Amino acid sequence: MASSTSTRTPAGKRVVNQEELRRLMREKQRLSTNRKRIESPFAKYNRLGQLSCALCNTPVKSELLWQTHVLGKQHRERVAELKGAKGATQGPSTGTVPQATKRRATDVESQDAKKAKASAGPQVQPSTSASSANLDAARAAPSKPGLGLLPDYDDEEEEEEEGGGEERRDSSKHLPDAQGKEHSLASPRETTSNVLPNDPFNTNPPKAPLVPHSGSIEKAEIHEKVVERRENTAEALPEGFFDDPEVDAKVRKVDAPKDQMDKEWDEFQKAMRQVNTISEAIVAEEDEEGRLDRQIGEIDEQIECYRRVEKLRNRQDEIKNKLKEVLTIKELQKKEEENVDSDDEGELQDLLSQDWRVKGALL
Protein backbone atom coordinates (compact mmCIF):
# COMPACT_ATOMS: atom_id res chain seq x y z
CA MET A 1 0.00 0.00 0.00
CA ALA A 2 1.42 3.45 -0.96
CA SER A 3 0.61 6.88 0.57
CA SER A 4 1.12 10.51 -0.50
CA THR A 5 3.86 11.23 2.02
CA SER A 6 5.77 7.97 2.38
CA THR A 7 6.15 4.62 0.67
CA ARG A 8 7.36 1.23 1.74
CA THR A 9 9.93 -0.84 -0.10
CA PRO A 10 9.52 -4.58 -0.64
CA ALA A 11 11.95 -5.14 2.23
CA GLY A 12 9.59 -3.26 4.61
CA LYS A 13 11.76 -0.13 5.10
CA ARG A 14 10.08 3.27 5.16
CA VAL A 15 11.21 5.86 2.59
CA VAL A 16 10.47 9.48 3.63
CA ASN A 17 9.64 12.02 0.92
CA GLN A 18 11.35 15.40 0.62
CA GLU A 19 8.22 17.31 1.64
CA GLU A 20 7.93 15.37 4.88
CA LEU A 21 11.61 16.00 5.60
CA ARG A 22 11.09 19.73 5.11
CA ARG A 23 8.06 19.68 7.40
CA LEU A 24 10.03 17.86 10.10
CA MET A 25 12.90 20.34 9.81
CA ARG A 26 10.48 23.28 10.16
CA GLU A 27 8.94 21.74 13.29
CA LYS A 28 12.39 21.17 14.77
CA GLN A 29 13.40 24.78 14.09
CA ARG A 30 10.14 26.05 15.61
CA LEU A 31 10.70 23.97 18.74
CA SER A 32 14.25 25.21 19.03
CA THR A 33 13.11 28.85 18.74
CA ASN A 34 10.24 28.38 21.21
CA ARG A 35 12.45 26.93 23.94
CA LYS A 36 13.06 29.08 26.97
CA ARG A 37 15.95 31.51 26.61
CA ILE A 38 18.24 32.27 29.55
CA GLU A 39 17.78 35.80 30.88
CA SER A 40 21.18 36.54 32.42
CA PRO A 41 23.78 39.28 31.86
CA PHE A 42 26.41 36.58 31.31
CA ALA A 43 24.33 34.47 28.88
CA LYS A 44 25.09 35.04 25.21
CA TYR A 45 23.55 33.53 22.06
CA ASN A 46 25.27 33.41 18.69
CA ARG A 47 23.66 33.48 15.24
CA LEU A 48 22.89 29.76 15.38
CA GLY A 49 21.17 30.12 18.76
CA GLN A 50 23.89 28.33 20.70
CA LEU A 51 24.21 29.38 24.35
CA SER A 52 27.57 30.41 25.84
CA CYS A 53 28.85 32.18 28.97
CA ALA A 54 30.34 35.60 28.19
CA LEU A 55 32.23 35.71 31.51
CA CYS A 56 33.92 32.31 31.24
CA ASN A 57 34.04 32.18 27.41
CA THR A 58 32.76 28.61 27.50
CA PRO A 59 29.85 27.18 25.46
CA VAL A 60 26.87 25.61 27.22
CA LYS A 61 25.22 22.71 25.44
CA SER A 62 21.65 23.51 26.47
CA GLU A 63 19.59 25.81 28.68
CA LEU A 64 19.09 22.96 31.16
CA LEU A 65 22.84 22.94 31.90
CA TRP A 66 23.04 26.73 32.50
CA GLN A 67 22.24 26.44 36.22
CA THR A 68 24.90 23.75 36.58
CA HIS A 69 27.44 26.01 34.89
CA VAL A 70 26.50 28.95 37.13
CA LEU A 71 27.01 26.82 40.25
CA GLY A 72 30.37 25.58 38.94
CA LYS A 73 33.71 26.53 40.51
CA GLN A 74 35.09 28.35 37.46
CA HIS A 75 32.05 30.63 37.07
CA ARG A 76 31.94 31.50 40.78
CA GLU A 77 35.66 32.38 40.80
CA ARG A 78 35.19 34.66 37.79
CA VAL A 79 32.23 36.40 39.47
CA ALA A 80 34.25 36.89 42.68
CA GLU A 81 37.16 38.37 40.71
CA LEU A 82 34.77 40.75 38.93
CA LYS A 83 33.26 41.91 42.24
CA GLY A 84 36.71 42.42 43.75
CA ALA A 85 37.80 44.53 40.78
CA LYS A 86 34.67 46.68 41.09
CA GLY A 87 35.28 47.20 44.83
CA ALA A 88 38.90 48.18 44.17
CA THR A 89 37.86 50.76 41.56
CA GLN A 90 35.14 52.26 43.79
CA GLY A 91 37.41 52.53 46.85
CA PRO A 92 39.87 55.22 45.61
CA SER A 93 37.08 57.27 44.00
CA THR A 94 35.20 57.58 47.32
CA GLY A 95 38.42 58.34 49.18
CA THR A 96 39.27 61.36 47.00
CA VAL A 97 36.06 63.25 47.84
CA PRO A 98 36.88 64.00 51.53
CA GLN A 99 40.36 65.26 50.57
CA ALA A 100 38.86 67.71 48.07
CA THR A 101 36.39 68.97 50.67
CA LYS A 102 39.24 69.39 53.19
CA ARG A 103 41.21 71.48 50.72
CA ARG A 104 38.19 73.62 49.89
CA ALA A 105 37.43 74.14 53.59
CA THR A 106 41.02 75.19 54.33
CA ASP A 107 40.97 77.56 51.33
CA VAL A 108 37.76 79.16 52.61
CA GLU A 109 39.22 79.55 56.13
CA SER A 110 42.42 81.14 54.77
CA GLN A 111 40.37 83.56 52.64
CA ASP A 112 38.22 84.55 55.65
CA ALA A 113 41.34 85.08 57.77
CA LYS A 114 42.84 87.36 55.09
CA LYS A 115 39.60 89.33 54.89
CA ALA A 116 39.52 89.71 58.69
CA LYS A 117 43.14 91.00 58.73
CA ALA A 118 42.42 93.41 55.89
CA SER A 119 39.35 94.74 57.67
CA ALA A 120 41.27 95.05 60.96
CA GLY A 121 43.97 97.28 59.37
CA PRO A 122 41.99 100.44 58.49
CA GLN A 123 39.71 100.27 61.57
CA VAL A 124 42.07 101.97 63.99
CA GLN A 125 39.47 104.57 64.89
CA PRO A 126 36.04 103.03 65.37
CA SER A 127 33.07 104.95 64.11
CA THR A 128 29.39 104.48 63.85
CA SER A 129 29.53 104.13 60.08
CA ALA A 130 32.17 101.36 60.26
CA SER A 131 30.27 99.44 62.93
CA SER A 132 27.00 99.68 61.02
CA ALA A 133 28.77 98.56 57.83
CA ASN A 134 30.31 95.61 59.66
CA LEU A 135 26.91 94.65 61.07
CA ASP A 136 25.34 94.79 57.62
CA ALA A 137 28.19 92.69 56.23
CA ALA A 138 27.80 90.21 59.08
CA ARG A 139 24.07 89.91 58.45
CA ALA A 140 24.57 89.47 54.72
CA ALA A 141 27.51 87.08 55.05
CA PRO A 142 25.60 83.84 55.83
CA SER A 143 23.53 84.14 52.67
CA LYS A 144 26.43 84.56 50.20
CA PRO A 145 29.31 82.20 51.02
CA GLY A 146 26.99 79.49 52.24
CA LEU A 147 26.51 78.36 48.66
CA GLY A 148 30.20 77.59 48.21
CA LEU A 149 30.16 74.00 49.43
CA LEU A 150 26.55 73.01 48.80
CA PRO A 151 27.31 71.04 45.58
CA ASP A 152 30.00 69.13 47.41
CA TYR A 153 27.52 68.06 50.05
CA ASP A 154 25.07 66.89 47.41
CA ASP A 155 27.72 64.47 46.17
CA GLU A 156 28.36 62.96 49.65
CA GLU A 157 26.90 59.68 50.78
CA GLU A 158 23.51 59.43 52.46
CA GLU A 159 25.01 58.30 55.76
CA GLU A 160 27.14 61.45 56.09
CA GLU A 161 24.11 63.61 55.34
CA GLU A 162 22.05 61.91 58.06
CA GLY A 163 24.93 62.10 60.57
CA GLY A 164 25.62 65.79 60.01
CA GLY A 165 21.97 66.82 59.70
CA GLU A 166 21.45 67.38 63.41
CA GLU A 167 24.73 69.31 63.80
CA ARG A 168 23.78 71.52 60.86
CA ARG A 169 20.42 72.29 62.45
CA ASP A 170 22.14 73.19 65.73
CA SER A 171 24.61 75.46 63.93
CA SER A 172 21.77 77.16 62.02
CA LYS A 173 19.94 77.74 65.33
CA HIS A 174 23.02 79.29 66.94
CA LEU A 175 23.66 81.70 64.05
CA PRO A 176 20.79 84.13 64.85
CA ASP A 177 21.80 84.13 68.54
CA ALA A 178 25.40 85.01 67.61
CA GLN A 179 24.18 87.80 65.35
CA GLY A 180 22.02 89.19 68.14
CA LYS A 181 24.92 89.10 70.59
CA GLU A 182 27.20 90.86 68.11
CA HIS A 183 24.57 93.53 67.54
CA SER A 184 24.27 94.05 71.31
CA LEU A 185 28.07 94.29 71.61
CA ALA A 186 28.28 96.73 68.76
CA SER A 187 25.62 99.10 70.19
CA PRO A 188 27.65 99.99 73.39
CA ARG A 189 30.66 100.63 71.17
CA GLU A 190 28.61 103.07 69.11
CA THR A 191 27.47 104.93 72.23
CA THR A 192 31.00 105.16 73.63
CA SER A 193 32.34 106.38 70.31
CA ASN A 194 29.68 109.09 70.22
CA VAL A 195 30.30 110.24 73.82
CA LEU A 196 34.10 110.05 74.08
CA PRO A 197 36.39 111.92 71.69
CA ASN A 198 39.01 110.17 69.63
CA ASP A 199 42.20 109.82 71.66
CA PRO A 200 45.25 110.37 69.42
CA PHE A 201 47.55 108.96 72.09
CA ASN A 202 45.72 105.62 72.33
CA THR A 203 48.32 103.05 71.35
CA ASN A 204 45.98 100.06 71.65
CA PRO A 205 43.80 100.04 68.54
CA PRO A 206 40.34 98.59 68.99
CA LYS A 207 39.85 95.02 67.95
CA ALA A 208 38.08 94.27 64.75
CA PRO A 209 34.41 93.40 65.14
CA LEU A 210 33.62 89.75 65.18
CA VAL A 211 32.27 88.68 61.85
CA PRO A 212 30.21 85.51 62.10
CA HIS A 213 31.35 82.81 59.74
CA SER A 214 29.00 81.35 57.24
CA GLY A 215 27.39 77.97 57.64
CA SER A 216 29.54 76.56 54.85
CA ILE A 217 32.72 76.65 56.98
CA GLU A 218 30.95 74.95 59.88
CA LYS A 219 29.68 72.34 57.48
CA ALA A 220 33.20 71.82 56.17
CA GLU A 221 34.47 71.36 59.74
CA ILE A 222 31.70 68.85 60.46
CA HIS A 223 32.49 66.98 57.27
CA GLU A 224 36.21 67.01 58.15
CA LYS A 225 35.43 65.50 61.56
CA VAL A 226 33.30 62.80 59.93
CA VAL A 227 36.10 62.00 57.48
CA GLU A 228 38.70 61.86 60.26
CA ARG A 229 36.50 59.54 62.31
CA ARG A 230 36.02 57.31 59.31
CA GLU A 231 39.75 57.24 58.60
CA ASN A 232 40.51 56.43 62.24
CA THR A 233 38.22 53.41 62.35
CA ALA A 234 39.56 49.91 62.93
CA GLU A 235 38.98 48.98 59.29
CA ALA A 236 41.65 51.44 58.12
CA LEU A 237 44.34 49.99 60.43
CA PRO A 238 46.57 47.34 58.86
CA GLU A 239 47.43 44.10 60.56
CA GLY A 240 50.39 44.46 62.96
CA PHE A 241 49.84 48.22 63.45
CA PHE A 242 50.38 47.80 67.21
CA ASP A 243 53.32 45.91 68.66
CA ASP A 244 51.12 44.09 71.15
CA PRO A 245 49.22 41.45 69.15
CA GLU A 246 46.34 41.36 71.65
CA VAL A 247 45.83 45.13 71.46
CA ASP A 248 46.11 45.00 67.68
CA ALA A 249 43.46 42.30 67.48
CA LYS A 250 41.20 44.17 69.94
CA VAL A 251 41.41 47.44 67.97
CA ARG A 252 40.82 45.72 64.63
CA LYS A 253 37.92 43.79 66.22
CA VAL A 254 39.25 40.37 65.33
CA ASP A 255 40.11 37.34 67.40
CA ALA A 256 43.22 37.51 69.57
CA PRO A 257 46.26 35.51 68.39
CA LYS A 258 45.91 33.10 71.29
CA ASP A 259 42.24 32.58 70.57
CA GLN A 260 43.06 32.30 66.88
CA MET A 261 45.70 29.67 67.63
CA ASP A 262 43.28 27.76 69.86
CA LYS A 263 40.66 27.96 67.15
CA GLU A 264 43.12 26.75 64.52
CA TRP A 265 44.28 23.98 66.88
CA ASP A 266 40.69 22.85 67.41
CA GLU A 267 40.09 22.88 63.66
CA PHE A 268 43.32 20.92 63.14
CA GLN A 269 42.30 18.35 65.75
CA LYS A 270 38.86 18.09 64.19
CA ALA A 271 40.40 17.55 60.76
CA MET A 272 42.80 14.96 62.20
CA ARG A 273 39.91 13.13 63.85
CA GLN A 274 38.06 13.08 60.57
CA VAL A 275 41.17 11.76 58.80
CA ASN A 276 41.66 9.13 61.50
CA THR A 277 38.06 7.97 61.26
CA ILE A 278 38.36 7.77 57.49
CA SER A 279 41.65 5.85 57.72
CA GLU A 280 40.20 3.51 60.35
CA ALA A 281 37.20 2.87 58.14
CA ILE A 282 39.51 2.17 55.19
CA VAL A 283 41.67 -0.19 57.31
CA ALA A 284 38.58 -1.99 58.62
CA GLU A 285 37.26 -2.35 55.10
CA GLU A 286 40.61 -3.71 53.92
CA ASP A 287 40.71 -6.15 56.87
CA GLU A 288 37.21 -7.31 56.06
CA GLU A 289 38.17 -7.81 52.42
CA GLY A 290 41.31 -9.74 53.48
CA ARG A 291 39.29 -11.89 55.87
CA LEU A 292 36.78 -12.67 53.14
CA ASP A 293 39.61 -13.51 50.74
CA ARG A 294 41.16 -15.85 53.31
CA GLN A 295 37.83 -17.54 53.95
CA ILE A 296 37.28 -17.96 50.22
CA GLY A 297 40.77 -19.48 49.90
CA GLU A 298 40.14 -21.87 52.78
CA ILE A 299 36.81 -22.90 51.27
CA ASP A 300 38.52 -23.55 47.93
CA GLU A 301 41.16 -25.69 49.69
CA GLN A 302 38.45 -27.67 51.50
CA ILE A 303 36.62 -28.24 48.23
CA GLU A 304 39.84 -29.48 46.64
CA CYS A 305 40.47 -31.81 49.60
CA TYR A 306 36.94 -33.18 49.33
CA ARG A 307 37.52 -33.84 45.64
CA ARG A 308 40.73 -35.74 46.40
CA VAL A 309 38.96 -37.76 49.10
CA GLU A 310 36.21 -38.66 46.65
CA LYS A 311 38.78 -39.71 44.08
CA LEU A 312 40.55 -41.89 46.65
CA ARG A 313 37.26 -43.46 47.72
CA ASN A 314 36.34 -44.20 44.13
CA ARG A 315 39.76 -45.72 43.55
CA GLN A 316 39.41 -47.80 46.72
CA ASP A 317 36.06 -49.10 45.55
CA GLU A 318 37.52 -49.97 42.16
CA ILE A 319 40.43 -51.84 43.79
CA LYS A 320 38.03 -53.71 46.06
CA ASN A 321 35.91 -54.73 43.10
CA LYS A 322 38.94 -55.88 41.17
CA LEU A 323 40.18 -57.83 44.19
CA LYS A 324 36.81 -59.50 44.54
CA GLU A 325 36.86 -60.44 40.89
CA VAL A 326 40.37 -61.88 41.21
CA LEU A 327 39.37 -63.87 44.28
CA THR A 328 36.32 -65.26 42.60
CA ILE A 329 38.39 -66.22 39.56
CA LYS A 330 40.93 -67.96 41.77
CA GLU A 331 38.21 -69.86 43.57
CA LEU A 332 36.76 -71.01 40.27
CA GLN A 333 40.18 -72.09 39.08
CA LYS A 334 40.71 -74.05 42.29
CA LYS A 335 37.38 -75.74 41.89
CA GLU A 336 38.16 -76.65 38.29
CA GLU A 337 41.57 -77.99 39.29
CA GLU A 338 39.98 -80.07 42.02
CA ASN A 339 37.48 -81.44 39.56
CA VAL A 340 40.25 -82.30 37.11
CA ASP A 341 42.28 -84.04 39.81
CA SER A 342 39.31 -86.06 40.89
CA ASP A 343 38.69 -87.16 37.29
CA ASP A 344 42.34 -88.21 36.85
CA GLU A 345 42.30 -90.22 40.03
CA GLY A 346 39.15 -92.02 38.96
CA GLU A 347 40.63 -92.98 35.61
CA LEU A 348 43.81 -94.15 37.29
CA GLN A 349 41.87 -96.35 39.67
CA ASP A 350 39.93 -97.80 36.76
CA LEU A 351 43.12 -98.66 34.98
CA LEU A 352 44.64 -100.18 38.05
CA SER A 353 41.60 -102.23 38.75
CA GLN A 354 41.77 -103.93 35.34
CA ASP A 355 43.96 -107.03 34.64
CA TRP A 356 47.34 -106.30 33.38
CA ARG A 357 46.98 -108.89 30.84
CA VAL A 358 43.90 -107.39 29.52
CA LYS A 359 45.65 -104.17 29.57
CA GLY A 360 48.51 -105.52 27.49
CA ALA A 361 46.13 -107.12 25.09
CA LEU A 362 44.36 -103.90 24.72
CA LEU A 363 47.61 -102.17 23.90
From Swiss-Prot:
InterPro entries: Matrin/U1-like-C_Znf_C2H2, ZNF830-like, Znf_C2H2_sf, Znf_C2H2_type. A zinc finger (C2H2-type) spans 53-75. One of its GO terms (molecular function) is nucleic acid binding. The modification Phosphoserine is found at S216, S342, S353. The modification N-acetylalanine is found at A2. Pfam families: zf-met (PF12874), ZNF380_CC (PF23406). The keyword Ion transport does not apply. Keywords: Acetylation, Cell cycle, Cell division, Chromosome, Coiled coil, Developmental protein, Metal-binding, Mitosis, mRNA processing, mRNA splicing, Nucleus, Phosphoprotein, Spliceosome, Zinc, Zinc-finger. GO terms for biological process: blastocyst growth; cell division; chromosome organization; intestinal epithelial structure maintenance; mitotic cell cycle; mitotic DNA damage checkpoint signaling; mitotic DNA replication checkpoint signaling; mRNA processing. Disruption phenotype: Mice die by the end of preimplantation development and exhibit a dramatic reduction in the total cell number, a high mitotic index, and the presence of abnormal mitotic figures. Mice appear unwell with significant loss of body weight and rapidly decline afterwards and die. Mice reveal major alterations of their digestive tract including a distended and filled stomach and an intestine lacking spontaneous peristaltism. The small intestine exhibits a thinner wall, less abundant and stunted villi and highly disorganized crypts. Residues 90-99, 189-205 have a biased composition (Polar residues). One of its GO terms (cellular component) is chromosome. It is found in: Nucleus; Chromosome; Nucleus speckle. Residues 129-143 have a biased composition (Low complexity). PANTHER family: ZINC FINGER PROTEIN 830. Component of the XAB2 complex, a multimeric protein complex composed of XAB2, PRPF19, AQR, ZNF830, ISY1, and PPIE; this complex binds preferentially to RNA. Interacts with XAB2. Identified in a pentameric intron-binding (IB) complex composed of AQR, XAB2, ISY1, ZNF830 and PPIE that is incorporated into the spliceosome as a preassembled complex. The IB complex does not contain PRPF19. May play a role in pre-mRNA splicing as component of the spliceosome. Acts as an important regulator of the cell cycle that participates in the maintenance of genome integrity. During cell cycle progression in embryonic fibroblast, prevents replication fork collapse, double-strand break formation and cell cycle checkpoint activation. Controls mitotic cell cycle progression and cell survival in rapidly proliferating intestinal epithelium and embryonic stem cells. During the embryo preimplantation, controls different aspects of M phase. This is Zinc finger protein 830. It comes from Mus musculus (Mouse).
